[in-house]
Amino acid sequence: MTEPNSEPAAVAPLMGATDIRRLAEEIGVRPTKTLGQNFVIDGNTIRRIVAAAAIGDDETVLEVGPGLGSLTLGLLDAAKAVVAVEIDPVLAEKLPETVRAWRPGAEENFHLVLSDAMKVTELPLPPTALVANLPYNVAVPVVLHLLQHFPSLQHGLVMVQDEVADRLAATPGSKIYGVPSVKAAWYGHMRKAGVIGMNVFWPAPKIHSGLVAFTRHDPPETHATREQVFAVIDAAFAQRRKTLRAALAGWAGSASEAERCLVAAGLDPTARGEVLDINAYVKIAEARHPVDA
């Protein structure tokens, strides 16, 4: 069993590169690209993430993909409880033992869920914050899924591929503004909170990671459903170089009906989807699905 290194009593020990590799060897784990496994091996980076997440000591933190537990330990130091969702059964089996070894007495504050995060709709505790090093290949769907199913999530900080971070935090009019940007804005305010270098991971990815912080707000007031609004967003960006009149023709049933909806929403039919904010998409959905229909 990998034991914690001795550190000054005032500073709780965190796992470093040697600890992570030794622990992985103990359980026969080799990081896989399929699951997007890149483990954080730098204690200072862990402390930076936890500090940037601004976690209160009364909060329950949801962590997705805890892996070998390096970030988990930092979160346990800051939060009242940590609920970790892990898809890999080998990693999940080892996590409670790691918590006991590195944070004696904190195991009662640690709750493990063996599952695919995209399938989780219930948790042992209602989380108030999301802090996670997310696999690059599923980062956006996971964030949107969790915000949809856990309204108790009020804020968070996620580490994702740097260009994905830019897209999540993009604003209307930007070249990288797209489906992730608009859908995320339904749930809250997203902002870029920093960049993480490649050398703090094992194995080291080929690109930098970005930190995205979010604060939840109420969804737009509308009689249209979230599904109806998101359908407009998907249609608008499926052909993002086309005018909205053309891009929404399939969604509306015809170009003329798309134009009618756009005009009813007070929008220019010749505009493109990348210039509209979430409230504009809500108005388009409302025009297509009137309350008295």
UniProtKB/Swiss-Prot annotation:
Keywords: Cytoplasm, Methyltransferase, RNA-binding, rRNA processing, S-adenosyl-L-methionine, Transferase. It is an enzyme of class 2 (transferase). GO terms for molecular function: 16S rRNA (adenine(1518)-N(6)/adenine(1519)-N(6))-dimethyltransferase activity; RNA binding. It is found in: Cytoplasm. S-adenosyl-L-methionine binds at N38, V40, G65, E86, D116, N133. It catalyses: adenosine(1518)/adenosine(1519) in 16S rRNA + 4 S-adenosyl-L-methionine = N(6)-dimethyladenosine(1518)/N(6)-dimethyladenosine(1519) in 16S rRNA + 4 S-adenosyl-L-homocysteine + 4 H(+). Its main location: cytoplasm. InterPro entries: KsgA/Erm, rRNA_Ade_diMease-like_C, rRNA_Ade_Mease_Trfase_CS, rRNA_Ade_methylase_Trfase_N, rRNA_adenine_dimethylase, SAM-dependent_MTases_sf. Its EC number is 2.1.1.182. PROSITE patterns: RRNA_A_DIMETH, SAM_RNA_A_N6_MT. Specifically dimethylates two adjacent adenosines (A1518 and A1519) in the loop of a conserved hairpin near the 3'-end of 16S rRNA in the 30S particle. May play a critical role in biogenesis of 30S subunits. This is Ribosomal RNA small subunit methyltransferase A.
